[in-house]
Amino acid sequence: MTSSLVGSEMCIRDRSTASPSCVTDALGNTACYAYDPRGRKTAEYGTALQPSVFAYDDADRLVSLMTFRVPGETIAADPQERTDGDMTAWSYDDASGLMTAKTYADGHGESYSYDDWNRLAVKRQARTVDGQGTPLATSYTYDPQTGNLVSVMHNDATPSLNYVYNHLNLLTQVADDSGTRTLAYNQYNEAESETTAGLAASALNYLRDGLGRSSGYSLHYGEGIVQQTAWEYDGCGRLSTVSLNNGDDPFVYGYHAVNGLLETLDYPNTLRRWYTREEKRDLLTRIDYLRPGSANYPAKTDYAYDALGRPTEKKDYFNTPAPGLTHSYSYNGRSELAADAMSRGGTYSYAYDNIGNRVTSREGSGASAEAYTANNLNQYTAITREEGASFAPAHDADGNQTKIQTSMGEWEVSYNALNQAARFIQGNRRVECRYDYLNRRIEKAVYEGDILMSKKRFIYHGYLQIAELDAAATESAMPVLRKTYLWDPLE
């Protein structure tokens, strides 16, 4: 073994592999690793890690992973001899090396088959689609000349996906549950526009400057442009301004003269957000909101951290010289939140098992304690409360939670072949959701019995929602634009 001290960490290395064998952090917590003669990691454990055991085949492919719950005992020693873990296993085709199955600790899992070109052809899940036990399956079809994926189909009611490409193998059209989406490119093969026909008929045009950098976008809906953004950059290539709908007063970004990190953000309404950071770790220590002429900060947040960079204190100021709310955070050796002591509202406290499932929690002064029971898939099967009704979550064979509890009570949830929540049911109340090819929710409809109460549709820029439409009256009129959203490109 060899050892070295780096900063406030000590690292002991395995002599035969030179890989870390035990790392002790600044607070004395240990992360230990074991290796086999071929240098493959076979276990990790210690006071700073959740214990795990790994096994491999002769081709160095991972064939099993064992994790441990064992509530009431903190496993810090080498777990390789333990037999009380939960195992996930992988199977492979001997000839190709392709993964053919993944099996979870309950015996359920997924299986995969491939075509003659070793491309995924069919994925079979644990759920079934009929009384004969036919597995829920997804089939993938490819262009015989280019090899591009052209369709994804399912043997249940989940809508299919269809793709079209140009001669450069760039995606030009997608047909999904939202309708048809057409993509266009400029002479540099950069995305130029995205036009959607269907549930939310709209056009999104992407803008670029002379250097090819994104300089904003414009959203067309109905008769014209409903949102337009413009981004500019400084001489160092950093975002300098963001304007909305050709406004005269943009958002302005300022950067630290030494480290180059974001320091200020000026709002069009004269408000300024100011960031202060630690000198060496660049961790945020303060976020100030400044308004000209104000005696106090409209809002301010102070942060403190421990030696591992974990937040230990957060002070929130609300237009007052003294903090209105203070959070004091503490952690266990595995960096899981153990307590949040608030200056008002009491303390939130949590305990965990060896894989990170909650075992107990108490949230706030006067709150009753809750105890959690987890199964071998790390799914909660029971939440028992000292006061009030307990709750027993349920899951389907693919691990999706089918019984949930919200502030509005308990709901039954069903999922499609892509494991997207498609329907929520509570008595005669029903919520139905639809998704596009990027797994973005594009419609949410709420029913009371057979009566439609509301229907909303959503438009996205990437994964960010930028518009909300009211589609409750789509039988007689096109959806009405209700909201648009502007997002900070740096966040």
What are the residue ranges of the model-derived segments?
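Intrinsically disordered, low-complexity Ser/Thr- and acidic-rich flexible linkers and loops
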Residues: V70-G85, R127-P135, S294-A295, P321-A322, ...
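Single conserved hydrophobic/aromatic residue that forms the stacking wall/gate
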Residues: M1-D14
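Surface-exposed extracellular loop regions of Gram-negative outer-membrane beta-barrel proteins
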Residues: A34, P321-A339, A394-R434
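Beta-strand-dense domains in secreted/periplasmic systems and polymorphic toxin scaffolds
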Residues: S8, V23, Y33, K41-Y45, ...
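Short, small/polar residue-rich loop motifs at catalytic or cofactor-binding pockets
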Residues: L27-N29, A48-Q50, G85-D86, D106-H108, ...
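Short, ordered secondary-structure scaffold segments
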Residues: A18-P20, A34-Y35, G97, N162-Y165, ...
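A residue-level detector for well-ordered beta-strand positions
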Residues: R13, C22, Y33, F54, ...
